[in-house]
């Protein structure tokens, strides 16, 4: 089994290291093609009018001066890799509901799906002030990936997985819940302040205060369980 890994937090992010550990625990061959710098909330942006700089940092590890979707394109069509799966993450922050259209993490998995490669986006919801137990998350991810591999994915669909945030320490794998993405929009609010002849608007909405549709991925993840959704192209 060959896993192509990418993310939007950057090639040196701890979430990508945790995803690498999870893949290796499954005995998979791992190739990493990830952004050289953080690309959070870049959506499905791709680069077509300027060259993409790619630095090979190790035998199977490439840093791309581009977006997550760029990384998948480079892997498939420049490096000519033939992965069985593209796994994107593990994002530091949830990608739930409306987030999936903003997320570079999800965009990478979506790009792979467009080209006929099985794909999953994996993210970890964050509660402020609580550290992430990355070693535990790697173990959980291994279990979840085993499940996803065993299940047939409809054509033109990808997996979106969101882990809940629990305090570090021993904890069994939370319940895995199949659910639909929330349809309610994120809360949006700004605070204004003068800036010479212009006005600055600072985003002030709090992610944790977003609407939680009953039975949705938001309700599931915020409630402490693992939200697993199928997204369609």
Name every feature range the model reports, one short phrase each.
Residues 113-136:
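Glycine-rich phosphate/pyrophosphate-binding loops
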Residues 94-103:
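Glycine/threonine-rich flexible loop motifs
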Residues 9, 38, 67-68, 91-94, ...:
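Short glycine-rich anion-binding loops that position phosphate/pyrophosphate groups of nucleotides
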Residues 134-233:
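Electrostatically charged, flexible surface regions
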Residues 33-35, 65, 88-91, 122-123, ...:
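Short beta-strand segments
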Residues 22, 108-112:
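Hydrophobic/aromatic ligand-binding patch that stacks against planar heteroaromatic rings
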Residues 2-3, 13-82:
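A cross-family phosphate/adenosyl-ligand binding-site feature
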């Amino acid at each position: 089994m060959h896993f192509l890994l990418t993310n939007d937090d950057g090639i040196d992010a701890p979430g990508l290291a945790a995803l690498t550990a999870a893949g290796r625990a499954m005995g998979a061959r791992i190739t990493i093609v990830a952004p050289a710098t953080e690309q959070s909330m870049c959506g499905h942006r791709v680069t077509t009018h300027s060259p993409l700089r790619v630095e090979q940092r190790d035998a199977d590890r490439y840093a791309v001066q581009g977006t997550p979707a760029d990384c998948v394109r480079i892997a498939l069509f420049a490096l000519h890799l033939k992965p069985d799966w593209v796994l994107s993450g593990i994002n530091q922050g949830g990608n739930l509901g409306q987030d999936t259209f903003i997320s570079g993490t999800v965009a990478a998995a979506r790009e792979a799906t467009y080209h006929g490669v099985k794909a999953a986006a994996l993210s970890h919801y964050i509660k402020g002030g609580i550290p992430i137990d990355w070693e535990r998350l790697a173990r959980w991810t291994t279990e979840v990936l085993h499940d996803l591999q065993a299940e047939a994915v409809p054509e033109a669909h990808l997996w979106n997985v969101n882990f809940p945030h629990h305090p570090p320490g021993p904890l069994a794998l939370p319940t895995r819940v199949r659910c639909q993405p929330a349809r309610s929009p994120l809360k949006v609010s700004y605070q204004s302040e003068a800036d010479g002849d212009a006005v600055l608007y600072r985003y002030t909405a709090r992610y944790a205060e977003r609407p939680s549709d009953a039975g949705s991925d938001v309700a599931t993840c915020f409630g402490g369980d693992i939200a697993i959704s199928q997204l369609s192209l």
